[in-house]
Every structure is written in structure tokens, then in C-alpha cells.
Amino acid sequence: MRRLIVLFAAALAVLGATAPALAAPKTETAVFAGGCFWCMEHDMQGVPGVLKVESGYTGGHLKNPTYRDVTSETSGHYEAVRVTYDPAKLDYGFLLYRYWRLVDPTDDGGQFCDRGPSYRPAVFVTPAQRPIAEKSRTEAAKRLKTGTMKTQILPAQTFYLAEEYHRDYAKRNKLNYFAYRTGCGRDARLKQVWGG
């Protein structure tokens, strides 16, 4: 019996020693607006170190906005994505680098075929993220093939999740998504802005 108690105690000690290794990784978030959140969500998913990408709304004055509120252009909100990532595998600077190549930062009237304030590009930052974002914007502006940088860097605000039917849209509606993306001219314009 005594031997069984010792073995049980040893097993608990081993399990306790490995508990930190089993703990969830520390995560951080980044919030980006870049026109249609379907496209931003799709293009940020699959980046190594990105754990989750969620479509939603931010930057406005209306609490709990709906898609209709946002696209009516009366709420002040942007269509945006919240990217949750593992900072041990991916840094914020790389996410910014990726972001710039997914948007036309020279267009402050919307993005591609989506027009209006809710479709403008913007980076929403915490105080710690601001200097990194500002430096990244300056570097990105030097690489533009056409136009001048107009994308704003704004203070992070409450992020409201979009309605369920907007989330993971590209995965659930592949044909509609790619028809929209192609018809909107997103990829063609990105080649003009960034080259390649």
C-alpha cells in the first residue's frame, strides 16, 4: 500500500511538472481594417503563428453594431479583422508587413470595389503597438509603386464580432467568395500598388 502511495505521489509530481508545457500559449491580438473583411480574414488565415482571425467592426460610436448599421455609414465603424497570434512564433511587425500587401493604402475612400468610410484601410493599435505600426507604415510608403500613403493608425477600440454568416465566409462560400474577390479587382489592384 505504501508503495502505491509513493507511485501515485510520483505520478502527480510528473503531471504537475508538465502542466506549464500543456498550458495555452500566450497570445496577442492585432486589429486591421482593409475593405471587405471576408478578404482580410481569408488572407490572414494560414499565416504561421496566427491562431484565429475574426471578422467584425471597430472604430465607431455605436455599441453592438450590425452589418446594416456599419454599411449605412452612420455608425463610424470600419469592417475589420481581429488577428489572434502566438508572439513566440510571429511578431507584430510581420503581421503589419503582411497587412500592407493586402490593402491599397493609397485609397482612403474605401478599398477596391467597396466604397465608403466603413471600407477604409486603418490599423488599430494599443499604445505599445503604435511605434511599431508607425515605423512599418513609413517603410511601406517607400515601397509603393503608385500613389501616396493614406492609411491611418488609430487607437484600438472595442471590437464587435460580425454576424455569424460573415465569419469564415471564404471557407463556407468558396465560389461566391472567389467570384466576389475577382470581380472586385482586388488582386489586380494590389499588383499595381505593390508590384509583382
From Swiss-Prot:
Which key words are in the record?
Answer: Oxidoreductase
Q: Does the keyword ATP-binding apply?
A: no
Catalytic residues as annotated in Swiss-Prot or TrEMBL: C36
Return one Gene Ontology term, BP aspect: protein modification process
Reactions catalysed, as given in the entry: L-methionyl-[protein] + [thioredoxin]-disulfide + H2O = L-methionyl-(S)-S-oxide-[protein] + [thioredoxin]-dithiol; [thioredoxin]-disulfide + L-methionine + H2O = L-methionine (S)-S-oxide + [thioredoxin]-dithiol
Function text: Has an important function as a repair enzyme for proteins that have been inactivated by oxidation. Catalyzes the reversible oxidation-reduction of methionine sulfoxide in proteins to methionine.
Record's protein name: Peptide methionine sulfoxide reductase MsrA 2
Organism of derivation: Caulobacter vibrioides (strain ATCC 19089 / CIP 103742 / CB 15)
Gene (name only): msrA2
